Swiss-Prot record:
Molecular functions per Gene Ontology: spermidine synthase activity
Protein name: Polyamine aminopropyltransferase
InterPro entries assigned: PABS (IPR030374), PABS_CS (IPR030373), SAM-dependent_MTases_sf (IPR029063), Spermi_synthase (IPR001045), Spermidine_synt_N (IPR035246), Spermidine_synt_N_sf (IPR037163)
UniProt-listed PANTHER family: SPERMIDINE SYNTHASE, SPERMIDINE/SPERMINE SYNTHASE
Superkingdom field: Bacteria
Limits of the PABS domain: 5-238
GO biological process, one term: spermidine biosynthetic process
Subunit structure: Homodimer or homotetramer.
Keyword Transmembrane helix tagged: no
Keywords: Cytoplasm, Polyamine biosynthesis, Spermidine biosynthesis, Transferase
Principal subcellular localization: cytoplasm
Lineage: Bacteria, Bacillati, Cyanobacteriota, Cyanophyceae, Synechococcales
Active-site residues (renumbered): 158 (proton acceptor)
Length: 283
């Protein structure tokens, strides 16, 4: 758009996090305002409706933590559903597993996919061309409702923060529908917000999943571009989860292609729940 640099800020409860750089894209889609900026430190960074979604600098903290605890521990992983994920990072991590036969990516905003394919090739890369991937421009809630029982082995909810058009992705009814379309041993993996900046939402997600599924586990790590810098991912299943039970040979192969995730990192991240969150969950 212009070679002039400017500050773009995300505001949250009296605080702000800003990046200075050249604006590559600024437009409003059917659903949200989309801004893509190029920053000296973070590289290209994507903002949706005033919230930073991803950047080239730190996106692997997010995508590797969302995907690999589930896919490296589950034996059957033929059919995968990604809700959201229009930047391509979750797809990129999924296609590393040869056992996967089909990946359905359901993204409501086609503009996010188009922009990511053109300007964020460093994230999705060749994963967009993987023959196992089918892209559906659709509402994730509606997609889940029309899916037959016991169809997916893993569901990834790679959504933005709760908003007017994404609130239902955090609802009891939606999680129950996800449980219905998962196989009996399937895993739901979702970003579950920050225990600091979005504490109440975070606790609500954890309590809801605990009530709906037989078992759930939450891990914490860093995503510097997000409010407070600490983020979480929660994994839930109708069976007893054992995310530390891994196929050693497969884990070592996947670790070689990761920048952040490895088994030691994962095991530590599952032990990082702040005590104030523990108390809230026990109350």
């Amino acid at each position: 758009m212009t070679n002039i640099t400017t500050w773009i800020d995300e505001y949250h409860k009296g605080s702000r996090f800003g990046l200075n750089g050249k604006i590559l894209i600024k437009k409003t889609s059917k659903y949200q305002e989309i801004i893509l900026i190029e920053n000296e430190y973070y590289g290209k960074a994507l903002m949706l409706d005033g919230c930073w979604m991803t950047s080239l600098k730190d996106e692997k903290y997010y995508h590797e933590c969302l995907v690999h605890p589930a896919l490296s521990s589950i034996e059957e992983k033929s059919n995968i559903l990604i809700i959201g994920g229009g930047d391509g990072g979750t797809v990129r991590e999924c296609v590393k597993y040869s056992q996967i036969s089909k990946i359905d990516l359901v993204e409501i905003d086609e503009e996010v996919i188009k922009i990511s394919k053109k300007f964020l090739k460093e994230i999705g890369g060749e994963a967009w061309n993987d023959k196992r991937l089918e892209i559906h421009v659709d509402d994730g809630v509606k997609w889940v409702k029309k899916t037959r029982d016991n169809f997916y082995d893993v569901i990834f909810i790679d959504s933005s923060d709760p908003s007017e058009f994404s609130n239902l992705l955090f609802s009891d009814s939606f999680y129950k529908e996800c449980k219905r379309i998962l196989t009996p041993s399937g895993i739901l993996a979702t970003q579950s917000e920050s225990p600091e900046s979005f504490k109440n939402i975070h606790i609500n997600i954890l309590k809801t999943l605990k009530n709906i599924f037989k078992s759930s586990e939450t891990m914490y790590s860093f995503v510097p571009i997000y409010p407070s810098g600490i983020w979480s991912w929660t994994f839930a299943s109708s069976k007893n989860l054992n995310l530390s039970k891994q196929n050693y040979d497969e884990v070592k192969k996947i670790e070689k292609g990761c920048e952040i995730w490895n088994l030691n990192f994962q095991n530590a991240a599952f032990k990082m729940m702040p005590n104030k969150i523990v108390k809230e969950l026990d109350s």
